[in-house]
Structure formats: structure tokens, C-alpha cells
Regions:
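N-terminal leader/targeting and assembly helices and adjacent pre-domain segments
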Residues: 1-171, 176-177, 281-287
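Extended non-catalytic scaffold regions that mediate assembly and binding
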Residues: 178-182
Length: 287
């Protein structure tokens, strides 16, 4: 079980790394736009424009390549830390009830799930950043065209047009394009990918441990500011494998009620909720 506060801050180191990449990319783009000052409105415009767009694309690819190794190492470190923390918290519950779960480090099933979670999260990261070069170069190209059009119209001088283009990119620059067409900054995309990967992997480990220990009931965590669809089921108790009435209490079906296993549900996209094992017949879990 991972606390919401832990999940909220888990991606911080990785996000900082990609914030630095964002800053480097924006500085490079601004520098290239400023070179418009040395040109006449029509002198070799198309050739220069093409060369600059290609240069931006290549520079972005190089910057991302330098960052990828650091990112993969941080993802692996974070996944190991989060998985260990989740299992320690979950196993405390089992020990409280006199049960003996196998050590996490010695459990081949759990270790395989952890490795699969790392591979999936790293793969998601690669997919997100794979579009960055084209996304950035496309925005750079559009900014050049807008600035060039302003100058040619006679309404702006080069200095004003360049400043406007740079300021606009600084305020609205996007780096990642999803298949749906939605765009994000690298910071937002990285945080979402890591948070989702860490929480989903921890959840799969907890489900596997529950299978091992014969657990039938789960309770979800709760935190302030939950999205309305999640507030409906946070802090409640559920039964795995269908709704039941047990010891005078109704327990809704875990997956059906929480949407666990779907992107929009428990432990889905950007979700900071998780769950833990309970044994209604044995009393409340440890605080």
C-alpha cells in the first residue's frame, strides 16, 4: 500500500530532470528564432527556415537521448523503492493477523511483476518522448512563419516579431503529442507516466499477494481533492469476485465498484488511490 502523499511526490526527481530538458529546448528554440534579426524578409527564407527546423529536430533528439539513460535508471530505482514500500506496508497487515507472507525479495511471482512494471513504465516513457522532436519542431516552424508574416505585413519590426514569437512559445510550448491529438509538456507527461506506472505496479503486487494469502476483501484509501468519480468509492470496503453480504454488512464488488483495471478507475491514469487487505472476521486492520 502506497500513501497518497508518497505517490504525489514519487515522480519529483524524474520531473526535475525533464524540466531541465524543457528549459534547454526552449533556450535553443529562442536562440534560433532570434537569428531572424539578421535576415531580410525574403532573403533565402525557405532554405533558412528548412535548415533551422531540421536543426531543432536533431538537437531535440540529441537532448532526449542524453536524458534517456538517466531516466531509465531513475525509473528502476523508483519502482524498486515503491514496490518495497508497498509490500512492507501490506505485509504488516498480514503479520498483524498472524499470517506469514513469503519475503518479497524471494517471491519469484512478485519480482516478475515488478520487472514487468518497470518495462511497461519505461516503454510508456519512450512512447511519450518519441513524438517530442516532431512536436517541438512543428511549433518552432509555426512560430517562425508567424514572425515572418508579421514582418512582411509591415505592422511589426523584426525585434517585436521575434520577441512575440519567443514569448508565445515560452507560455504555450508543448512537447508530447498523444495519439488522440492531445498535447502536454514533458513535465506533465513524465509525472503522469511515472505516477501511473508506480501505482499500477504496486497494485498488481498487492493483488498477487492477496491471491497468495487467500484475501477476499479490500479497503480503498482516501485523500482530499479526489475527482468526483473516485470520491464515490474512496475509503470503502469491497469484496473480490462479486458483491456479498457478510457478517451483517454489504460489500460491493471490488472491480465493478472502483473500476480497478481500467484507465479511469482505481490505480488508473494519474490516480493516487490504492487499497489494502482486510479480514472482517478478524477485526480492524492495524492503524
Amino acid at each position: 500500500m502506497l500513501a497518497p502523499d508518497y505517490l504525489d511526490h514519487a515522480p519529483d526527481r524524474l520531473v526535475l530532470l525533464w524540466q531541465q530538458v524543457e528549459d534547454d529546448i526552449l533556450r535553443d528554440v529562442a536562440r534560433r528564432i532570434s537569428k531572424m534579426d539578421t535576415m531580410t524578409p525574403t532573403a533565402h527564407w525557405q532554405l533558412w527556415r528548412y535548415q533551422q527546423v531540421e536543426a531543432v529536430r536533431q538537437d531535440v533528439v540529441k537532448k532526449l537521448a542524453r536524458c534517456t539513460g538517466k531516466s531509465e535508471a531513475e525509473i528502476r530505482r523508483l519502482m524498486q523503492e515503491a514496490a518495497t514500500r508497498a509490500m512492507e506496508a501490506e505485509d504488516e497487515i498480514y503479520y498483524h493477523y498472524g499470517k506469514e507472507p513469503t519475503p518479497f525479495a524471494d517471491n519469484a511471482t512478485l519480482q516478475a511483476l515488478l520487472n514487468a512494471g518497470y518495462q511497461q513504465t519505461a516503454g510508456t516513457f519512450h512512447n511519450l518522448t518519441a513524438t517530442t522532436a516532431n512536436t517541438v519542431s512543428g511549433q518552432f516552424e509555426a512560430a517562425l512563419d508567424r514572425a515572418h508574416l508579421k514582418v512582411n505585413s509591415g505592422a511589426f519590426d523584426y525585434k517585436s516579431a521575434v520577441k512575440s514569437a519567443v514569448d508565445s512559445l515560452a507560455d504555450t510550448m508543448k512537447y508530447v503529442t498523444y495519439p488522440t491529438g492531445h498535447t502536454d509538456t514533458l513535465e506533465v507527461a513524465a509525472r503522469r507516466a511515472v505516477l501511473t506506472g508506480v501505482n499500477q505496479t504496486g497494485a498488481k503486487l498487492q493483488v498477487a499477494r492477496a491471491d497468495e494469502m487467500g484475501v477476499e476483501f479490500f479497503e480503498t484509501t482516501a485523500h482530499g481533492g479526489a475527482r468526483p468519480s473516485h470520491a464515490e468509492w474512496q475509503g470503502r470496503q469491497f469484496h473480490r469476485g462479486g458483491a456479498v453480504d457478510y457478517m451483517g454488512k454489504h460489500y460491493p464488488d471490488f472491480e465493478a465498484a472502483t473500476g480497478y483495471g481500467t484507465g479511469a478507475g482505481l490505480c488508473g491514469w494519474n490516480c493516487r488511490h490504492t487499497f489494502f487487505a482486510i479480514f472482517p472476521e478478524l477485526g480492524a486492520p492495524p492503524a
